[in-house]
């Protein structure tokens, strides 16, 4: 599976993410072992990193935070996330798809 997969049914984007918590700023770093590496500022304590990641992705894709689904990796750095019907696709992600 690729880092970014465009889905037809249901329509959306499935992302395989390698998460780097406690970074100096929120950013898409690039590819890391066939996953999209994303750095976020939140610590990996009590789900703070997951919540911050979903909030960051909702801003990037211009979708409600509640619509983004964390499919795999709730307690790991390796995650699989589904973003339904994104209004905007960031150029860093579009070139990978």
UniProtKB/Swiss-Prot annotation:
Q: Which InterPro entries match?
A: DUF167, YggU-like_sf
Quote the Pfam families the UniProt record gives: DUF167 (PF02594)
The Gene Ontology CC terms held by the record are:
cytoplasm
SUPFAM superfamilies in UniProt? YggU-like
Q: Which PANTHER family match?
A: UPF0235 PROTEIN C15ORF40 (PTHR13420:SF7)
Q: Which family is annotated?
A: Belongs to the UPF0235 family.
NCBIfam families per the UniProt record, alphabetical: DUF167 family protein (TIGR00251), PRK05090.1 (NF003466)
Q: How is this protein named in the record?
A: UPF0235 protein HAPS_1504
């Amino acid at each position: 599976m690729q880092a970014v997969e465009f889905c037809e049914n249901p329509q959306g984007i499935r992302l395989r993410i390698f998460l780097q918590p406690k970074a100096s700023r929120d950013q898409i770093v690039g590819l890391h072992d066939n996953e999209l590496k994303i750095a976020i500022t939140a610590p990996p304590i009590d789900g703070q990193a997951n919540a911050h990641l979903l909030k960051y992705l909702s801003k990037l894709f211009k979708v409600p935070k509640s619509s983004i689904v964390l499919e795999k990796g709730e307690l790991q750095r390796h995650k699989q996330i589904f973003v339904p019907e994104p209004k905007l696709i960031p150029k860093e992600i579009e070139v990978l798809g």
